[in-house]
Amino acid sequence: MDTIVRRDMIFDNVQVCSGQKREALRAISHLCAKDDMAYELKLIAAFREREALYSTGFGGGIAIPHARINGLAEPLFALARFDRPVEWDAIDGKPVDLAVVAVTPGEAERDIHLPILAMLARKLMDENFVRRLRACTDKTQLYYYMLRELPPVKA
């Protein structure tokens, strides 16, 4: 796998009218599923199951919703910037405006899932990376910034 970044998985100004995590996860699932209702429902269920274990609110206005889904052909990475802050039960108690999403095949715990999460966590702890990410003004800038900054993930 060369890169996990795909242009069609960068979402800007995602509407979350209620400002609640449940609706945000539903919106992310809908956008990522691209009109595949069965896949959308799997994503929603997988994200909710993970959130029931612990919040994926990373802190600093960022969440890393992630899940594993059996039978998934390849890992999915998405970036969603919300139209308003979302209450997420983050570790710092602050609402979330950016969600960095990782979904991997259920069989890929050691091979792909953990390396992707570790790489994302390292990048998101870098204040300069996050500041420049937030400075992107549209979907195109977000895409090219992420493409340039995220290293390839070895499958």
Enumerate the predicted regions with their spans.
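Cytosolic covalent-transfer regions centered on His/Cys nucleophiles
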Residues: 1-155
